[in-house]
Swiss-Prot record:
Protein name: Acyl carrier protein
Sites of O-(pantetheine 4'-phosphoryl)serine modification: 37
Keyword terms, alphabetized: Cytoplasm, Fatty acid biosynthesis, Fatty acid metabolism, Lipid biosynthesis, Lipid metabolism, Phosphopantetheine, Phosphoprotein
Pfam families registered for this protein in UniProt: PP-binding
HAMAP family hit by this protein: Acyl_carrier
Domain Carrier: 2-77
Pathway assigned to this chain's UniProt record: Lipid metabolism; fatty acid biosynthesis
PROSITE patterns per the UniProt record, alphabetical: CARRIER, PHOSPHOPANTETHEINE
SMART domains recorded: PKS_PP
One Gene Ontology biological process: lipid A biosynthetic process
GO CC terms, sorted: cytosol; membrane
Gene: acpP
Organism of this sequence: Albidiferax ferrireducens (strain ATCC BAA-621 / DSM 15236 / T118)
Length: 79
């Protein structure tokens, strides 16, 4: 597991109040991890803070799974 993947999974577990072991790449935030719309907004904000990035609304709407979040962080992270 890469450092970014581990950081993303830790943030998701903390934000959604689930065990980190439940946070696997194929899981969807809403369907599998019980997130609601406010949770997903807070999750995007936490990812922005952690990786020093800004996630536009149109991109945020596409981040619906753990793997989407990992891929986005890998692609857009600041050095």
């Amino acid at each position: 597991m890469s450092d970014i993947e581990a950081r993303v999974k830790k943030i998701i577990a903390e934000q959604l109040g689930v065990e980190e072991a439940q946070v696997t790449s194929e899981k969807a935030f809403v369907a599998d991890l019980g997130a609601d719309s406010l949770d997903t907004v807070e999750l995007v904000m936490a990812l922005e803070d952690e990786f020093g990035i800004e996630i536009p609304d149109e991109d945020a709407e596409k981040i619906t799974t753990v793997q989407n979040a990992i891929d986005y962080a890998n692609t857009h992270k600041k050095a």
